[in-house]
Amino acid sequence: MVKRKANHVINGMNDAKSQGKGAGYIENDQLVLTEAERQNNKKRKTNQ
């Protein structure tokens, strides 16, 4: 899981209280998926 800096956080504020837990970072899970999992996701989306 890759974390990168978010651009919606206001400097000088209490991140945990005002902007949600873990504010300041974007977690990108898409890079972790294997090819088989991607294919399965496509099948699930078409079945919905």
From Swiss-Prot:
Name of the gene this protein is made from: sspO
Protein location: Spore core
Keyword Lipid biosynthesis: no
Family: Belongs to the SspO family.
NCBIfam families: spore_sspO
Keywords: Sporulation
GO annotation, cellular component aspect: endospore-forming forespore
Alphabetized InterPro entries for the sequence: SASP_SspO
Main location: other
Name of the featured protein: Small, acid-soluble spore protein O
Gene Ontology biological process terms, A to Z: asexual sporulation; sporulation resulting in formation of a cellular spore
Stretches the record annotates as Disordered: 1-22
Induction: Expressed only in the forespore compartment of sporulating cells. Expression is sigma G-dependent.
